[in-house]
Amino acid sequence: MSAKEVRFGTDARGRMLKGINTLADTVKITLGPKGRNVILDTSYGAPRITKDGVTVAREIELSDRFENVGAQMVKEVASRTNEEAGDGTTTATVLAQAIAKEGMKAVAAGMNPMDLKRGIDRAVAIVIAEIRSMSRPVGDSAEIAKVGALSANGEAAIGRQIADAMAKVGTAGVIKVENKGLETETEVVEGMQFDRGYLSPYFITHAQKMVVELDDCAILLHEGKLTSLASMVPLLEAVVQAEKQLLVVAEDVEGEALTTLVVNKLRGGLKVAAAKAPGFGDGRAAMLEDLAVLTGAHLISAELGTKLETVTLDMLGFAKKVVLTKDSTILIDSAGDKAAIASRIGQIRNQIEDTTSAYNKEKLQERLARLAGGVAVIRVGGATEIEVKERRDRVEDTLNATRAAVQEGVVPGGGAALIHAGKALAGLKGDNPDQDAGIKIIRRAIQAPLRQIADNAGIDGSVVAGKVIENDSATFGFDAQLETYGDMLQAGIIDPTKVVRIALEDAASIAGLLITTEVIIAHKPERGERMSQMDEMGGMM
């Protein structure tokens, strides 16, 4: 085991806080309509320009191991918020920094960290309850477009494209974002999404996004388990000869079969991925039949008398693009016969009418939505590759924000909801003075996003926060784009309730862990690493 370095108490927290500030100060300059861009150097290709908080956070790795612990913990806030809400990562980072900074000051002043955390948790619960009570449902497509425009830093065209895509496939429909040429456009294609992802991370083709993307893809559908691919070798060779990529969908793919596919992918002989079939029992068989109709495949099943050794290339289904995450698979522009798909849809509709079971009806309606809904594809354009990448980041953030708004409604935006929800903490007391201090930490910290939005617009954040707090209206706030005060809802400045809620929950959770940390244990650099660090320091002098 390699040697470790240990830091205690104030020294440990001080080093962590320095790392927290380095990461948060880098990320928070992107917040709000007048937030600035960050340029990321890449190991290959052109630099990347972005205003996406989680993208910036993921790039930060500090050389000091103890500072890096703090930075990585706050990076976890951004990642968790992005995973749960899809947006609000910069807000979560700003909140985490504010809570951690105030909390560590209180610990340094001799307060009990555990009581501070109890006070923080109590205050957060009340603020979130208040945010929920302020929330109102999203109305029509125009309001969805407003949410989108705000998330896209005021670019109304992006908001309209998201609203248009949702109008075509439904608010719960599948919407995929891709790169294109000069113009951004939206198209609905035949496709389906199901809730099973890749069976091995070795199939991943885009490490940064942790996804598998297969183009011009052949699809093998198998009803049973695959444990060996010996009988499939001629088929695999035929797929390679046809210059196709391959998706294998089966009840399970394990043992030698999974190993064979992974090795083929890693050696570059065949671009391939495997996923479990969706559903359970009879539902799985029905879903596989839906997939077969949609992709034009023959379902390989002992009941149907088809065996792996007899499968030929023309028995596989096809899709122009397949995208797999760890949790889902999307088939885009699949090659099934339109008449067969329409017939299958009619069959499912008849089953919905005939069934008396509420559970069966729900499952049939899910299948119908998957088959009939299609996939909306937003193709993002721009004059240069750098512009396309930056624009795609914003479109993906916008899509996530609008989905969140549809799920839980919206609240006044621009940091106003947190400020007004914080008024519910007036008069709240803990069980002791240290818990009271934890409550005060949250009262101050929830002002941080509004302050930062104002600072990024070149206006004193303290003055702006003070004016918003003084106003009794729960919808009163600051429009950083126009540098005016007014009703946020009337101005169309709204945030998804889910994004605000999760940003605060995740920030308070991680900051609470940081405040209650007393010891950090880190890997001690080897001699070569120490010499390298000394050389870097020498070069800076």
Curated annotation (Swiss-Prot):
Pfam families: Cpn60_TCP1
Biological process annotations from GO: protein refolding
Enzyme Commission number, as recorded: 5.6.1.7
HAMAP family: CH60 (MF_00600)
Family to which this protein belongs: Belongs to the chaperonin (HSP60) family.
PANTHER family: 60 KDA HEAT SHOCK PROTEIN, MITOCHONDRIAL (PTHR45633)
Protein name: Chaperonin GroEL 2
Organism: Cereibacter sphaeroides (Rhodobacter sphaeroides)
